[in-house]
């Protein structure tokens, strides 16, 4: 088993020397400065790989090579974006980086409701509270039909939370779910963007005609297209 660590590039406050000191062997990272859909060149990959190796570590996993929204919902630019993805995969392989994570969820990449949840021993961690996410989904985002995705008990808890949640907590929830956990991963929404809820809604609207089965079909189409490159 290899001890790996998610590292968010040279701007990460956790540096590679720190990770080496605590026994980390492999790095999980990506080319965070390359816009979604653009090709990861062998030069850019090699540069980051060499930088990581200069600290006695290795680039073990790509997390992630972003799948553009147009690939997921089947937009007109899908074919070109898939071709770019295939080239990026091939370039990673040429550079010896063999494990690549991807995400096919609409709009979101990962969700937490708290990025510094305190624990009794004085430590903190990322945290997901399902009721707070449901509150965000129903009361803040106002997603059409969202109530149907939750139980009566969960809806009751959302109502109870609505009685006590502060405006500051609402803003923190928006910042955590939309900006912090999405922006640095897929670049759709960035720090400083005005009205991130409206931006999030516009992105979500791209999927208004996409049901579960269509999304699965689009995922199958994508995987079928890239698999020959992966197998090489």
Task: State where each predicted segment sits.
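N-terminal pre-domain/capping segments
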Residues: 1-231
